[in-house]
Amino acid sequence: MSQLCPCGSAVEYSLCCHPYVSGEKVAPDPEHLMRSRYCAFVMQDADYLIKTWHPSCGAAALRAELMAGFAHTEWLGLTVFEHCWQDADNIGFVSFVARFTEGGKTGAIIERSRFLKENGQWYYIDGTRPQFGRNDPCPCGSGKKFKKCCGQ
């Protein structure tokens, strides 16, 4: 039996993000690219992360930083809670929560990632980190307050 994809899709990895991470296919939209990039973090694939960063970002210079992060970070799960894009605009956004442990402490990245499509391929550009009040509902959709969920 194959393993489930780390991206949280509940689909086997070989049928989900593997074709993108392996280079067999190009991610068809920002959500698939973001999910496959999360898998690359889980599987410590710096080459895929660098390849899918927009060339203007100079991602190759981040290789050492990525490799150092791999050694100290364990990824625990991904929740995508919003995505929007239009192929005609060549720009898209994906909002997500990625949970991890680092140095024995649990944390979460909550980001609205921006993607750009050039020559038929989507690239990660950058992301913003929205601010949430401690008593706001958690954006991951758990129904809990932010302070009792991803804000810990």
From Swiss-Prot:
Pfam families: SEC-C, YchJ_M-like. Disulfide bonds: none annotated. SUPFAM superfamilies: NTF2-like, Sec-C motif. InterPro entries: NTF2-like_dom_sf, SEC_C_motif, UPF0225, YchJ-like_M. Belongs to the UPF0225 family. NCBIfam families: PRK01617.1 (NF002449), PRK01752.1 (NF002486). This is UPF0225 protein YchJ. It comes from Shigella boydii serotype 18 (strain CDC 3083-94 / BS512).
